[in-house]
């Protein structure tokens, strides 16, 4: 069972690799669901990690209805990821009706020629996931990341099971959202998904002297709480599938 860990900083990338992760999804700002990471993070992760790295291609948070400028931005980001040596990219685009935007996806996949392509959880907003799955297969996507159109992958386990049965090995189904050591084994037993995706997040407190009168952005966020990958969660999940 391959385990993909999504990360948004170099500390987490190293923890994930050293804890047994099989692949990294390199993102910016996981608190927003993940956006395109900076050039410097992509390059540094690729320089110091020796497991496959897929780069998130998402120009902003919010919906997956992109304008012409954003499409060009995504194409450029894919070219950068390719030039830096990434093994794959993570994409997704929908129409106003909640269908896979075939035109945009064709452009992005063409830009990614030679790289692996994962379609991200925009899939969980599809109006018809079963038709959408066939479209992703036709597009040539390597895998789709999905929670089975539910809040968590465990809640969507029976939809995931149906998607796996429909896919018949033509595309990998990777379950993500709320995956943890307490539900991973049961999730896989029921759904038979090919891979698991998780952030395995924890946090450490900053050692920097603070100023409680100032916040840097969202007031609900603690600027002195540093989110990182929890090695114990990864080790525990890997162990589940080795027994």
Swiss-Prot record:
One of its GO terms (cellular component) is cytoplasm. One of its GO terms (molecular function) is copper ion binding. Keywords: Cytoplasm. Disulfide bonds: none annotated. It comes from the Bacteria. The keyword Cytoplasm applies. It is found in: Cytoplasm. It holds the Pfam family CutC. Its main location: cytoplasm. Belongs to the CutC family. This is PF03932 family protein CutC. It comes from Histophilus somni (strain 2336). The gene is cutC.
